């Protein structure tokens, strides 16, 4: 069984930064932890035409990752995210050391 990275990207909607950060701390991170997903890295894009934020979580297996992504809790979290961010996207990749896109 190989570890899997959940890579998530998004742009905070202009003027919604305060609402986003409150949501992130009070709901997003606790909801992920409730699903057994712990964020391990996060990056902010300061130059270029890429999503403003990239966050990653390492999961123990593809089966575990699929179970999380198929859950109603994950779907609900995505709906809440879309109210505050644009271009929310995610993908699963085999975990390697270091930064991954």
Regions found by a protein language model. Name each.
Residues 4-11, 56:
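Active-site-flanking beta-strand signature of metal-NTP-handling nucleotidyl enzymes
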Residues 42-45:
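Short, solvent-exposed loop/turn elements at beta->coil junctions and helix N-caps
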Residues 23-40, 58-93:
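An amphipathic, aromatic/His-enriched active-site/gating alpha helix that lines ligand/cofactor pockets
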Residues 11-23:
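Short, surface-exposed ligand-recognition loops at beta-strand->loop->(often short) alpha-helix junctions
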Residues 93-101:
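Short, low-order "capping/linker" segments at domain edges
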Residues 1-2, 101:
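Basic/polar N-terminal segments that are highly enriched at the extreme N-terminus
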Residues 3-5, 36-40, 53:
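Short, flexible segments with low predicted structural confidence
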Residues 47-51:
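Short acidic/glycine-enriched loop/turn segments that link adjacent beta-strands
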